[in-house]
Amino acid sequence: MAMKEAFPEDYLSQEELEPSLNVSHHENPLAGRAKRKRTVKNTEVKKRTLKNTEVMKMTEKKTEEAYLVKVEQLAKLKQKQEEDKAAVTLHCFSKTSETGKDVVAPPEGFEQMQSLRFIDNNYTKLKPSDIQGQVDPLFPEVILCVEIYNSRKVKTQEFLVLGRQMLTELKDNIHCATDQVMQKAGKYDPSGYFLIEDVFHNDLRNPSAKDYSYPILDWLWNSKDEALKKWECVLTGELQKKQKLVLGEAKSVDLPRYRTADMQSTHFCDIRFRVGASYVYCHQGDCKHTIVIRDMRMSHPEDVQNRAAYPIMFWPKRRIQKCGVCKIKRASKVAVDDKWASENSSYFCDVCFELLHSEEGPLNCDFPVFDYVHE
């Protein structure tokens, strides 16, 4: 104390120097400046990151809101379309219009509508129309899937039939253009038969029907030698080769033992058949079809339970033959060797045929012309 009091100026200068020395010893001005820069930079990076995150969240929110708005708009549009479909009726297809008068579509317009409709090759199930009377429930029953092929081996129809149904019920539902042609010519023949496992099932319901199997059986009985030779020619081929490979020598060939039965008194459950085998349906003299029983199963709850609805028919959507000139109307005539046509055979509707082959007078037809029937 005495020293401080004696030399106060020296002690004051020393006390002032000590803090400055301490500061100069612990702190570097360049290091502090770099540290401050790093702090500012980190702060800016954090701010930018937060800003980008907020922008992304806002963008996602706006996108989600836009999607929700579009979904709501589509839902409203679909609901409006359904309401419009339920409310709108096409008066041209109804029997009466809004005025209460009968409306009849002209045949030309109806024909064009049939021609212009879209047709593909898929099969469509033809549901039976409203069936009058009491509904006969379907108890556990055998259901057969029967396919019908034309002479070109193209499947034209497919049926689901019950085991208790008659063969005539299937025959009456088989569609063939030959029936229409013969009926139009006034030569329709109600006769016909199914040849299934060496049995001719003849349709003799109509008094004017003929037994198509009689001349065949008569030839077999009275010309056995000739029939046997022809039968050997039929069997010559893969079957004979297989028999020789297995047995060493083919067995003697015998004619099948054909017999007849009435179609109208035969149920499907009464006949012997092989699933997947080909059988014959013949009608109108010599129009033959191939029938194949493709499947056999028991009925289940998903099947149509009304027995009166069977046989249920499946029909392929067919491509209608159009007129080769206008490409709009359905063809009604087919011409062979027509010098005015670009193709042979050529198809025409009535209007185009008359315009092309008449010069203000009778038709100039020095070539065969036939009425065309759509299959």
From Swiss-Prot:
UniProt keyword Transcription present: yes
Primary residence: nucleus
Family: Belongs to the SNAPC3/SRD2 family.
Subunit structure: Part of the SNAPc complex.
Induction: Transiently induced by auxin (2,4-D), with a synergistic action of auxin and cytokinin on transcript levels.
Cellular compartments per GO CC: nucleus
UniProt tissue specificity: Expressed in seedlings, apical meristems, developing leaves, roots, stipules and flowers.
Protein name listed in UniProt: snRNA-activating protein complex subunit
GO molecular function annotations of the record: DNA binding
Protein's job: Transcription activator of small-nuclear RNA genes (snRNA), which have essential roles in pre-mRNA splicing and rRNA processing. Essential protein involved in the establishment of apical meristems and organ primordia, embryogenesis, cell differentiation and cell proliferation, probably by modulating the establishment of auxin gradients.
Claim: Cytoplasm is one of the keywords in the record: no
InterPro entries xrefs: snRNA-activating_su3 (IPR022042)
Gene Ontology BP annotations: auxin polar transport; auxin-activated signaling pathway; cell cycle switching; cell dedifferentiation; cellular response to auxin stimulus; cellular response to cytokinin stimulus; lateral root formation; longitudinal axis specification
Keywords from the UniProt entry: Activator, Auxin signaling pathway, Cell cycle, Developmental protein, DNA-binding, Nucleus, Transcription, Transcription regulation
Location relative to the cell: Nucleus
